[in-house]
């Protein structure tokens, strides 16, 4: 060892490198200028010899520590372009010095990260192939604040955690390193040395790809390497008002399809506006349908590459179909390479061990009190919406986030006020939804929540949580229970059918007959009474009733369904999208009106779906009895023509063909407390939908000259009569008047009561004074 090189050795730092405890390797290794030339140091465990090569010149390095620490002084006053040549037992490798390159993370990044506002963390965290200073490689970044040391390991360094320790940012606990030569497709992990000399190997929380089971290593991927063709769609999405548009969602898993093209063709043919995909993110267990998520930023290897998934989204957009992803910000799985105790300490999970594991699922719950965990989840949501152009997120198990005692009989810790609300989760959801809406106003944010949290879909500005929609679990449970009852007994459970209209406007709802609700078509049919033909009739009736009930729609009939059922669904979606009455006033009381809801003996309900235009009104008649009805009289909203535009019992849908092919003209026969009515055929276990065309007003009589003169003579009388004859009020005005009169009557009664009370009190006072 030369005396000059020896004099430049920082032995305590070299010892930290050799023992795998160095957190600032860029300050020790790599090149630096000295008065005696350029000092270059490197650590190559198991190496036999090492040299620095600059152009055609080779400088042998001196072994400073027998563990494999080498150094050399080369002449010059500027750092040259160089590479290492290292001889191992079986091979000699030439590679660039990772510590000759600076980092990407800045103090501004650190401050945003620590503040919980690092919404684009996905752009720098994880592994990103790039060119730095003209050299191709990959930049790695990970958060492990309590780690003694973090290294990147892979085939490129024989999975040796001593070889490439990462540089720790002083303020945040973020580690980063640019490694020349590492490229897309290379597998890697982080080796984390925790306190107590414990070595952990962890997958990258921000990794964009994984190896399949049983390895689950992270894989370097370039997710920006795709050319999109949906610029028009994305521009329209920013101004999309889903509350005034039809939303019919097809729920499915990519695992059900041989190819993405098949899914695109199916969804387009059936007329859906959106598809909702079970988690496409990586997950551990086959058969779990994607839950829980193990790699949040990676498309599952089961479904192909990131580029293939991007192509699927792009194709769906080009045929006018939006894409919603199931997303799980509530929990993550327990496995050695996952987020649990990532750096040897509770980092992503709740710190209280009693509250960290959910007893129902055995999964870990996120610590929403941590700004850095918020960064991880919010940037993940932004990642799917912005990088993969996804149009919405359906958030799973929101009730498990909102309630501290969800699924727990005991062993839970109340909040600071002694109640069961998870205050940190509430604030996280408000933060998440407000940021996503600010960045992408057209993104759909949907909650799956059954805990009856009030006003979940009201805005964050009103101090609520700010979802666009929530699943209507109450409607689904009540309706499926009603359908499971034999039609003969359904009259005893009629309220299960009508109850939902009492709360249909309390939230912005999506009605679901999804995979969780009914399973496959075979499983759905197994829940229903009757023979196979009756079961299929009730499946058609169920989808039809959902389509005409207030609320957006989501269904999961599966890919392999009978042709007739497919035609029925296609017809329903076509009708739904072309009928403003079925979606335009979903959130308004005036968009729905009962005609008859009390015919429980007959298992029949009748109602109207409306807009502000009478000619767009639809009349809906649902017969949940197993028998048809002939000449069934129904009250109608006005005189005019009524044409059956859909019947779930049509022969083309596999039904009996009990339809009304002729247009019905309303007659002035009172029914259902209405002046006009029609008589129709009702199919058993069927839904009929009628368009309503108001009748023309009667033509005015021709006025004669004599009549005109008479009217002029009696002008004063005519004006007097007109003044005394009030204009006919609309139904809406009449309702408002009645409500106003009722309120006035109630106030008057209350005033009279108060006066009587005061009078009695005065009388008592007078008697007492006497």
Q: What would you call each of these model-derived segments?
A:
Residues 145-147, 155-157, 193-195, 280-282, ...:
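An acidic- and aromatic-residue-enriched active-site/binding cleft used to recognize and process polar
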Residues 389-391, 406-559, 577-634, 638-649, ...:
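Conserved alpha/beta catalytic core and glycan-binding cleft of carbohydrate-active enzymes
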Residues 1-246, 255, 261-268, 491, ...:
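Carbohydrate-interacting/catalytic domains
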Residues 142, 190, 252, 277, ...:
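Generic structural signal for small/hydrophobic residues in well-ordered secondary structure
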Residues 258-259, 305-308, 372-377, 421-428, ...:
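Soluble or luminal CAZymes and related metallo-dependent hydrolases
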């Amino acid at each position: 060892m030369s005396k000059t090189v020896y004099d430049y050795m920082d032995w305590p730092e070299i010892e930290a490198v050799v023992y795998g405890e160095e957190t600032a390797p860029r300050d020790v290794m790599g090149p630096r200028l000295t008065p005696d030339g350029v000092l270059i140091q490197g650590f190559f465990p198991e190496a036999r010899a090492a040299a620095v090569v600059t152009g055609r010149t080779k400088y042998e390095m001196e072994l400073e520590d027998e563990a494999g620490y080498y150094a050399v002084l080369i002449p010059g006053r500027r750092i040259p372009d160089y590479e290492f040549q290292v001889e191992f037992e079986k091979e000699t490798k030439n590679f660039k010095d990772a510590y000759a390159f600076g980092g990407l993370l800045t103090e501004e990044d650190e401050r945003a990260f620590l503040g919980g506002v690092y919404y684009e963390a996905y752009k720098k965290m994880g592994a990103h192939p790039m060119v730095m200073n003209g050299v191709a490689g990959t930049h790695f970044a990970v958060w492990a604040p309590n780690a003694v040391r973090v290294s990147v390991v892979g085939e490129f360094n024989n999975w040796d955690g001593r070889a490439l320790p990462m540089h720790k940012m002083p303020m945040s606990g973020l580690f980063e390193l640019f490694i020349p030569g590492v490229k897309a497709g290379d597998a890697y992990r982080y080796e984390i040395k925790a306190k107590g000399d414990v070595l952990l190997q962890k997958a990258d929380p921000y990794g964009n790809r994984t190896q399949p089971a049983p390895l689950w290593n992270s894989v370097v991927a370039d997710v920006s390497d795709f050319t999109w063709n949906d610029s028009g769609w994305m521009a329209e999405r920013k101004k999309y008002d889903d509350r005034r548009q039809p939303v019919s969602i097809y729920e499915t898993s990519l695992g059900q399809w041989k190819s993405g093209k098949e899914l695109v063709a199916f969804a387009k043919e059936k007329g859906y506006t959106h598809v909702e995909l079970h988690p496409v993110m990586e997950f551990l267990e086959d058969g779990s349908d994607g839950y829980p998520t193990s790699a949040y930023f990676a498309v599952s290897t089961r479904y192909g590459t990131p580029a293939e998934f991007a192509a699927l989204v792009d194709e769906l957009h080009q045929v006018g179909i939006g894409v919603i992803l199931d997303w799980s910000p509530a929990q993550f799985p327990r496995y050695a390479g996952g987020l649990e105790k990532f750096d040897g300490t509770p980092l992503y999970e709740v710190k209280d061990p009693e509250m960290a594991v959910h007893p129902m699922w055995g999964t870990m719950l996120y610590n929403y009190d941590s700004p850095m965990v918020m960064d991880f989840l919010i940037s993940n949501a932004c990642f799917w919406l912005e990088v993969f152009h996804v149009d919405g997120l359906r958030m799973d198990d929101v009730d498990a986030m909102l309630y501290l005692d969800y699924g727990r009989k005991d062993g839970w810790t109340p909040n600071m006020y002694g109640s069961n609300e998870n205050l940190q989760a509430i604030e996280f959801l408000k933060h998440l939804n407000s940021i996503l809406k600010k960045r992408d106003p057209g993104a759909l944010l949907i909650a799956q929540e059954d805990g009856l949290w009030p006003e979940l879909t009201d805005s964050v500005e009103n101090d609520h949580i700010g979802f666009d929609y929530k699943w209507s679990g109450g409607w689904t449970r009540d309706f499926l229970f009603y359908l499971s009852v034999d039609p003969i007994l359904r009259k005893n459970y009629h309220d299960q059918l009508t109850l939902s209209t009492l709360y249909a406007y309390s939230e912005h709802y999506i009605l679901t007959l999804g995979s969780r609700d009914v399973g496959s078509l075979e499983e759905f049919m197994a829940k229903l009474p009757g023979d196979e033909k009756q079961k299929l009739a009730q499946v058609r009736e169920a989808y039809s009733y959902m389509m005409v009930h207030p609320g957006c729609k989501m269904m999961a009939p599966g890919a392999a369904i009978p042709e007739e059922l497919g035609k029925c669904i296609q017809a329903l979606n076509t009708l739904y999208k072309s009928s403003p009455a079925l979606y335009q006033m979903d959130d308004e009381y005036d968009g729905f009106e009962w005609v008859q809801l009390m015919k429980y003996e007959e298992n029949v309900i009748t109602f109207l779906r409306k807009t502000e235009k009478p000619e767009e009104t639809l009349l809906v008649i649902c017969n949940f009895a197993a028998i048809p009805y002939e000449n069934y009289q129904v009250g109608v909203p006005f005189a005019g023509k009524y044409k059956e535009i859909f019947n779930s019992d049509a022969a083309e849908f596999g039904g009996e063909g009990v339809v009304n092919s002729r247009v019905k003209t309303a007659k002035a026969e009172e029914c259902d407390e209405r002046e006009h009515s029609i008589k129709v055929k009702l199919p058993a276990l069927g839904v009929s939908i009628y368009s309503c065309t108001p009748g023309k007003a009667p033509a005015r009589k021709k006025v004669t000259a004599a009549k005109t003169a008479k009217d002029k003579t009696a002008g004063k009388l005519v004006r007097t009569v007109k003044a005394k004859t009030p204009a006919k009020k609309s139904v809406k005005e009449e309702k408002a008047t009645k409500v106003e009169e009722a309120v006035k009557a109630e106030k008057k009664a209350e005033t009279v009561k108060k006066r009587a009370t005061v009078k009695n009190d005065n009388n008592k006072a007078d008697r007492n004074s006497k």
